[in-house]
Amino acid sequence: MTKLPSLTGKDILSILKKLGFEIKRQKGSHVFLQNPDVRATVFPIHSGETIGPGLMAKILRDVNMTKEEFYQLLK
């Protein structure tokens, strides 16, 4: 299993935008993204703070991706 590097909310946002996700709404620091397949996820964007492993696992489940698939997008 591949261990992902520490990523910020902005890093994850840019990767998900490449996959076709769009920001549907934002309340405070929490961003709600959705793609045309109606998959959606919510995560915070705090400047300088990284997303923890538990929240990263939730985001990957929400967008129906494995760590390996996500890691390929980082390269």
Feature annotation, model-predicted:
Residues M1-K27:
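N-terminal first-folded block
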